[in-house]
């Protein structure tokens, strides 16, 4: 499942690789994996960083992460609870803990943690800004929260991943509320195994937020998103 091509200028490529929050993002110079579970390590022959949002089974697989890290030498960036679970399997110089408002650089790519409204120990969401300034908001499996409006206004997101199912309390409606608050150029409904939920999200978006495009992803397919003009 590696992305064997480079994004166009002012763009990123991404792949959704499980029914949860598993996303692979490729910028011009870096490959970043988020919440890898239910997939084989050999699917990721290249990785510069793995980001973990929280410690639940559908987001954190310590054995898989250790296998990918050993093969690629990548850096692991994780919330405090996940970092604690990884501390004995990841070299100390390759494991970085992150909390909301912290920022870590992966080369010229910025990784910033934000709040996540989800019943885990200390969950985070991630703002990833590419070398070209393309802004991606990976919201883990967060429910909406009021601060999203200010975050969206500040960041002017190009793409936001919105949970529409599986996680507690989530639905197409809560996913749409994340999009409504953040107002991205492109909204991606994920964290579901229901195409019906994704379609419902798309209908809400078209009716209530027509200036935001909906991209319904298929598993393992490569998509490109460009910086807003």
Feature locations, PLM:
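A short acidic, amphipathic alpha-helical/loop segment
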Residues: 63-68, 89, 147-151, 174-178
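Alpha-helix capping/helix-boundary segments
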Residues: 21, 57, 82-84, 102, ...
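Proline-aspartate-enriched helix->loop->beta-strand connector
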Residues: 73-74, 156-157, 161, 166, ...
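Short, Asp-centered acidic motifs that coordinate Mg2+ and/or phosphate
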Residues: 31-32, 49, 159, 186
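Core dinuclear metal-dependent hydrolase active-site scaffold
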Residues: 1-45, 97-155, 170, 217-229
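Binuclear metal-ion centers of metallo-dependent hydrolases, dominated by the metallo-beta-lactamase
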Residues: 16, 90-107, 151, 176, ...
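Active-site metal-binding motif and surrounding structural segment of the metallo-beta-lactamase
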Residues: 38-82, 154-161
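Catalytic metal-binding/acid-base residues of hydrolase active sites
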Residues: 56, 82, 117, 143, ...
């Amino acid at each position: 499942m590696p992305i064997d091509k480079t994004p166009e200028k002012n763009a990123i490529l991404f792949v959704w690789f499980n029914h949860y929050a598993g996303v692979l993002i490729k910028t011009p110079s870096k490959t970043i994996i988020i919440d890898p579970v239910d997939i084989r390590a050999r699917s990721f022959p290249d990785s510069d960083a793995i980001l973990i949002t929280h410690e639940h089974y559908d987001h954190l697989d310590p054995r898989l992460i250790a296998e990918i890290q050993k093969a690629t030498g990548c850096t692991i960036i994780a919330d405090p609870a996940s970092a604690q679970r990884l501390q004995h399997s990841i070299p100390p110089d390759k494991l970085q803990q992150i909390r909301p408002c912290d920022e870590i650089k992966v080369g010229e790519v910025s990784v910033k943690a934000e709040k996540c409204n989800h019943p885990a120990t200390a969950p985070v969401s991630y703002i990833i800004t590419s070398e070209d300034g393309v802004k991606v908001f990976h919201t883990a499996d967060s429910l909406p929260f009021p601060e999203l409006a200010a975050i969206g206004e500040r960041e002017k997101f190009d793409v936001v991943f919105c949970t529409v199912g599986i996680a507690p309390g989530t639905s197409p409606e809560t996913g749409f509320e994340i999009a409504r608050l953040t107002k991205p150029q492109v909204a991606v409904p994920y964290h579901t195994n229901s195409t019906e939920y994704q379609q419902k999200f798309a209908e809400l978006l078209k009716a209530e937020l027509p200036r935001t495009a909906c991209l319904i992803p298929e598993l393992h397919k490569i998509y490109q998103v460009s910086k807003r003009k």
